[in-house]
């Protein structure tokens, strides 16, 4: 049964069908093999509706909407300016500023695609003019934008939290440590690259200029305070923090900065609605698929066949990491989370792994796979945004992928990288 379900999904994917079709088809075929007729198909529909019922999913469209508003407005530009003013003058400062700006914008958007557009579009021309090779610039933007998938408000963590019934607030806090570690590694590599390639430094900003850019960026810097401070302080749930971010973004861009009209807001809302519809269809289809394979005990069959339960916690984490990394090299990250999390859930529970640690590792692997050839989705986002050939986008990625894989291995052996802040925030 498992072979039939997954073979059907693979064939449909290879034929080019949208991601939701293989999920629904796999669930439907599994349903027919279980019950033998169509008399109880309403059960599968009920499972799809149940999958999109959790209130925490409301945070997804809200964070997407807030990110789109900031991308079209001035918030992203103000964050870029303040980072450039403080670190742009050091060796590799422009590249370090790009990585830092991606991290800062990721901390208010949770979207890798929005980060590529908002940060990559204005900074790539400046980096090329400064003497950086385009292959390095593209790889830096793609991989630094993936930090947005790890640090709060990560949309990937929201989906994982819903599918696995794990605290989204704890996942958000756990992603901060690995995200900052990645930023440090990318910054160190940017410095080494600039030294080896004799990239000239940018002019040092005056203290008056730094103060001016800081004042301009104070309003956009309120987003992380709302998200992290609000959740940590017990003021907001993640869903409430998302709603507060939307309201804050609208007030900033429409009333304070006056960078968007009501017509712009309407266009942004339409775009968000389209993306949200796709995400929710995927989540609903994934819920039906998860119910079918769980009912048929497919996860137990697969995991029993490879003997994963005898590997111990470290071995299980390595298998999970490899599965999600490879999966996201070929398939959309949300689909990989929806399909594989239910498969590994029984063994995660049986070996006593912390679901927050597992979620952090999974989210990191999803981010790495999304930026890895041959079909990582972030690669094609960069191709579409910057109009550059595939070979040029992927040429500079190996050093970044190796650093990200190094962080994932460190997380497995030193879980406190992720769990220290979680334990501190939630007194565990």
Swiss-Prot record:
Pfam families: DctM. Its main location: membrane. It comes from the Bacteria. GO terms for molecular function: transmembrane transporter activity. It is found in: Cell inner membrane. Keywords: Cell inner membrane, Cell membrane, Membrane, Transmembrane, Transmembrane helix. GO terms for cellular component: plasma membrane. Part of the tripartite ATP-independent periplasmic (TRAP) transport system UehABC, which imports both ectoine and 5-hydroxyectoine as nutrients, and not as osmoprotectants. The complex comprises the extracytoplasmic solute receptor protein UehA, and the two transmembrane proteins UehB and UehC. PANTHER family: C4-DICARBOXYLATE TRAP TRANSPORTER LARGE PERMEASE PROTEIN DCTM, SIALIC ACID TRAP TRANSPORTER PERMEASE PROTEIN SIAT-RELATED. Transport is enhanced in cells that are grown in the presence of ectoine, but not by high-salinity media. Belongs to the TRAP transporter large permease family. This is Ectoine/5-hydroxyectoine TRAP transporter large permease protein UehC. It comes from Ruegeria pomeroyi (strain ATCC 700808 / DSM 15171 / DSS-3) (Silicibacter pomeroyi).
């Amino acid at each position: 049964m498992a072979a039939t379900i997954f073979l059907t999904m693979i064939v449909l994917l290879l034929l080019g069908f949208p991601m939701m079709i293989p999920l629904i088809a796999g669930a439907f075929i599994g349903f027919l093999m279980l019950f033998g007729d169509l008399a109880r198909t309403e059960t599968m529909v009920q499972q799809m509706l149940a999958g999109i019922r959790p209130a925490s999913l409301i945070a997804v469209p809200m964070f997407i909407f807030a990110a789109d508003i900031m991308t079209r407005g001035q918030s992203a530009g103000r964050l870029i300016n303040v980072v450039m003013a403080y670190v742009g003058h050091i060796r590799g400062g422009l590249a370090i500023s790009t990585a830092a700006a991606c991290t800062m914008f990721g901390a208010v958007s949770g979207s890798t695609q929005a980060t590529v557009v908002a940060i990559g579009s204005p900074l790539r021309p400046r980096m090329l003019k400064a003497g950086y090779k385009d292959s390095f610039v593209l790889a830096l933007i793609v991989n630094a934008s993936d930090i947005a998938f790890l640090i709060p408000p990560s949309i990937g963590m929201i989906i994982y939290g819903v599918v696995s019934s794990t605290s989204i607030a704890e996942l958000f806090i756990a992603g901060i440590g690995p995200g900052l570690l990645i930023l440090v590694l990318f910054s160190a590599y940017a410095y080494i690259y600039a030294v080896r390639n004799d990239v000239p430094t940018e002019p040092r900003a005056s203290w008056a200029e730094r103060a001016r850019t800081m004042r301009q960026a104070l309003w956009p810097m309120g987003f992380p305070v709302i998200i992290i401070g609000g959740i940590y302080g017990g003021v907001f749930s993640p869903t409430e923090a998302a709603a507060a971010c939307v309201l804050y973004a609208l007030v900033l861009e429409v009333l304070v900065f006056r960078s968007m009209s009501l017509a712009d807001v309407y266009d942004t809302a339409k775009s968000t609605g389209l993306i949200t519809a796709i995400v929710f269809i995927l989540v609903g289809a994934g819920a039906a698929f998860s119910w079918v394979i769980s009912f048929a005990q497919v996860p137990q069959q697969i995991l029993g066949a490879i003997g994963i339960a005898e590997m111990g916690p470290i071995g299980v984490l390595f298998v999970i990491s490899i599965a999600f990394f490879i999966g996201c090299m070929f398939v959309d990250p949300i689909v990989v989370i929806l399909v594989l999390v239910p498969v590994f859930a029984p063994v995660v529970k049986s070996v006593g792994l912390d679901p927050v640690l597992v979620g952090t590792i999974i989210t990191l692997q999803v981010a790495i796979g999304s930026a890895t050839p041959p079909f990582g989705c972030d690669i094609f986002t960069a191709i579409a945004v910057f109009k550059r050939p595939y070979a040029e986008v992927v040429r500079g990625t190996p050093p970044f992928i190796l650093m990200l894989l190094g962080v994932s291995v460190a997380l497995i052996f030193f879980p406190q990288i992720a769990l220290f802040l979680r334990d501190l925030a939630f007194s565990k």
